């Protein structure tokens, strides 16, 4: 195997190896998914390290490494990556030991020179600051990540202890942080875990209590289905949905896969129930604002552009779905399934795992978590991110089959003049939604939770309880841009305080009991 560092081949007993999934191939570089060991999170929980530590430990990040000449690899493959244990120890020393040692020595020398306590503290602070310079220089030279190398695609299993140590090293190197709206808190070491790259995000699946061969077979099925979803449901990449959008813009009907037809019908029904606040037909508005691209936009759209978007008036009820044939009466309709595709993907993944005989698993897609069964004697415990601070609002223990999805303005956005413009577009104004920072929805269906979270971000203060009731969701947490927190009685009863309490008082809002469910016109 090719050496990973400056000190020779990666074959010694101190070398750490890990099997990582390739999410992209960029010339002579590979983008791989690297996560911190679940065992670390379990240890942190047991020792009371705190929720923030747990959440920063248990997540996945992307890392770029060099691709050896001649290595043939494609997204979805797995590669063996090695890191020298010596380099890991050196990085830990630079990060933790050198600053502490430099500070203590500086204080001792300053005191010996007769400086006052204030002067000694000042000298120690300056020395402490400069003691981080070697670590900064190391990172500028790509740090530990630049010392990782891979040589071959594999399908084997690495030694558990060295896998855990390697993940810890990658976490140190990559500076992992909290991402997404929800995060699994209770995380014992999984029997089998896989990370997939779907819809521009990392989707983690962990199974428990089944033989590894059975779990690996199930993961292979999931991987194939996720790749198909990513290809067929992407609005701005070659695939079935892009072809459908082109056909509708030309006034033509289009034959789609039965799975996509079912998803579009579900989206149409949810759009009607939300009174159009959730509407996948506004992909043209998303594209006009630039949120379809990988990089965030930089400019506010003019009133003329917005007026043109509104004049098109695209909506899901413009669609007619007959079996697997789809057509639109409005050429302005451009479908973007991003507001509920992750939830729908988790629903399908849950069905795949159940069909494979797997009873206990957790699926984590950044802003959404869905669970099967539990992880022993305890339910899966999930944190809801505080959109204002580094921490969480609270935690929810999920029951088997439940899904918790969060949407908000804190992930994809740009700022102009102190105003945040998010990727969630209000179909009524053709502009990014305002006034709400995040909404979390708990239900027994991933697509419903995902879509409702988007709709309730857009809904106004007076309308959101009615919209929630119409969409059939009862457990909702809503945070506005002034920091106010609102929860339905069902969500308030499930929400658990962490880290000493909630970040703000929670106002309980009752949902109306008798609401008329809007019906979609036939089509």
UniProtKB/Swiss-Prot annotation:
Gene Ontology biological process terms in this record: nitrogen fixation
Residues passing through the membrane, by range: 88-108, 118-138, 169-189
Gene3D superfamilies from the UniProt entry: ApbE-like domains
Membrane topology term: Multi-pass membrane protein
Predominant localisation class: membrane
Residues noted as binding Mg(2+) in the record, renumbered to the chain: 339, 450, 454
Disulfide bonds: none
Its job: Flavin transferase that catalyzes the transfer of the FMN moiety of FAD and its covalent binding to the hydroxyl group of a threonine residue in a target flavoprotein. Is likely involved in the modification of RnfG and RnfD. Required for nitrogen fixation.
Name this polypeptide is given: FAD:protein FMN transferase
Species name: Rhodobacter capsulatus (Rhodopseudomonas capsulata)
């Amino acid at each position: 195997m090719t050496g990973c560092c400056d000190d020779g081949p990666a074959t010694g007993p101190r070398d750490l190896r890990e099997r990582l999934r390739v999410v992209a191939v960029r010339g002579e570089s590979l983008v791989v998914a690297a996560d911190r060991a679940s065992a670390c999170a379990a240890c942190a929980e047991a020792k009371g390290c705190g929720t923030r530590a747990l959440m920063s430990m248990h997540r996945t990040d992307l890392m770029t490494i060099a691709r050896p000449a001649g290595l043939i690899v494609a997204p979805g493959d797995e590669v063996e990556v090695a890191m020298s244990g010596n380099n890991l120890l050196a990085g830990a020393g630079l990060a933790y030991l050198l600053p502490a040692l430099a500070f203590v020595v500086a204080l001792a020398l300053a005191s010996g020179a007769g400086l006052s306590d204030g002067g000694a503290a000042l000298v120690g602070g300056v020395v402490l600051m400069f003691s981080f310079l070697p670590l900064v220089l190391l990172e500028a030279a790509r740090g530990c990540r630049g010392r990782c190398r891979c040589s071959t695609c594999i399908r084997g299993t690495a030694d558990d202890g060295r896998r855990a140590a390697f993940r810890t090293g990658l976490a140190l190197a990559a500076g992992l942080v909290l991402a997404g709206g929800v995060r699994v808190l209770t995380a014992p070491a999984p029997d089998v875990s896989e990370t997939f790259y779907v819809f521009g995000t990392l989707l983690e699946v962990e199974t428990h209590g089944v033989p590894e061969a059975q779990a690996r077979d199930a993961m292979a099925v999931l991987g194939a289905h996720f790749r198909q979803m990513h290809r067929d449901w992407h609005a701005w990449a070659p695939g079935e949905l892009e072809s459908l959008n082109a056909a509708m813009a030309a006034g033509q009907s289009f034959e789609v896969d039965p799975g996509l037809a079912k998803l579009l019908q579900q989206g149409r029904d949810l759009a009607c129930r939300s009174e159009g606040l959730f509407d996948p037909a506004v992909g043209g508005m998303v594209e006009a604002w630039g949120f379809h691209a990988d990089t965030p936009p930089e400019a506010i759209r003019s009133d003329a552009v917005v007026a043109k978007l509104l004049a098109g008036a695209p909506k899901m009820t413009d669609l007619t779905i007959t079996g697997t044939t789809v057509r639109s009466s409005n050429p302005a309709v451009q479908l973007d399934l991003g507001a509920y595709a992750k939830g729908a993907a988790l629903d399908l993944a849950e069905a795949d795992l159940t069909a494979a005989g797997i009873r206990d698993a957790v699926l984590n897609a950044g802003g959404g978590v869905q669970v099967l069964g539990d992880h022993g004697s305890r339910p899966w415990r999930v944190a809801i991110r505080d959109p204002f601070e580094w921490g969480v609002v609270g935690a929810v223990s999920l029951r088997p089959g439940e899904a918790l999805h969060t949407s908000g303005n804190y992930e994809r956005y740009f700022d102009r003049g102190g105003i945040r413009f998010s990727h969630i577009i209000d179909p009524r104004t053709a502009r990014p939604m305002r006034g709400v920072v995040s909404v979390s929805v708990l239900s027994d269906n991933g697509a419903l939770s995902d879509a409702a979270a988007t709709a309730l971000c857009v809904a106004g203060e007076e309308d959101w309880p009615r919209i929630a009731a119409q969409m059939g969701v009862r457990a909702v947490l809503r945070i506005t841009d002034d920091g106010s927190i609102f929860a339905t009685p069902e969500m308030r009863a499930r929400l658990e305080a962490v880290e000493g309490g909630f970040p703000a008082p929670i106002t309980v809002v009752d949902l109306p009991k008798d609401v008329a469910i809007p019906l979609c016109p036939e089509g």
